[in-house]
Amino acid sequence: KKKCIAKDYGRCKWGGTPCCRGRGCICSIMGTNCECKPRLIMEGLGLA
């Protein structure tokens, strides 16, 4: 089963593949999937 792993600066990997083209991504609570967020939201969260 794939798992979402959060990297720095709003990047995630999903089973070894970058989510959301590697940017603007957060993992769900249990790391079961990744959610793509627009860059503006990421900047608002201080993750961009």
Curated annotation (Swiss-Prot):
One GO cellular component from the entry? host cell presynaptic membrane
Q: Which UniProt keywords apply?
A: Calcium channel impairing toxin, Disulfide bond, Ion channel impairing toxin, Knottin, Neurotoxin, Presynaptic neurotoxin, Secreted, Toxin, Voltage-gated calcium channel impairing toxin
Where, by tissue, is this protein expressed? Expressed by the venom gland.
Q: Where in the cell is it found?
A: Secreted
Q: Which domain of life is it from?
A: Eukaryota
> Could you give a GO molecular-function term held by this entry?
toxin activity
Q: Does the keyword Disulfide bond apply?
A: yes
Please give the positions of the paired cysteines in each disulfide bond.
C4-C20, C12-C25, C19-C36, C27-C34
Does Secreted show up as a keyword for this record? yes
Q: Which CDD domains match?
A: Spider_toxin
What does the similarity note say?
Answer: Belongs to the neurotoxin 02 (plectoxin) family. 03 (omega-agtx) subfamily.
- Its function? Omega-agatoxins inhibit neuronal voltage-gated calcium channels. This toxin acts by modifying the gating of the high voltage activated P-type Cav2.1/CACNA1A channel. Is a potent blocker in both insect and mammalian central neurons.
Tell what the record comments on domains. The presence of a 'disulfide through disulfide knot' structurally defines this protein as a knottin.
Q: What else is known?
A: This toxin is a diagnostic ligand for P-type channels Ca2.1/CACNA1A in the mammalian brain.
The protein here is known as Omega-agatoxin-Aa4a
Highest lineage ranks of the organism? Answer: Eukaryota, Metazoa, Ecdysozoa, Arthropoda, Chelicerata
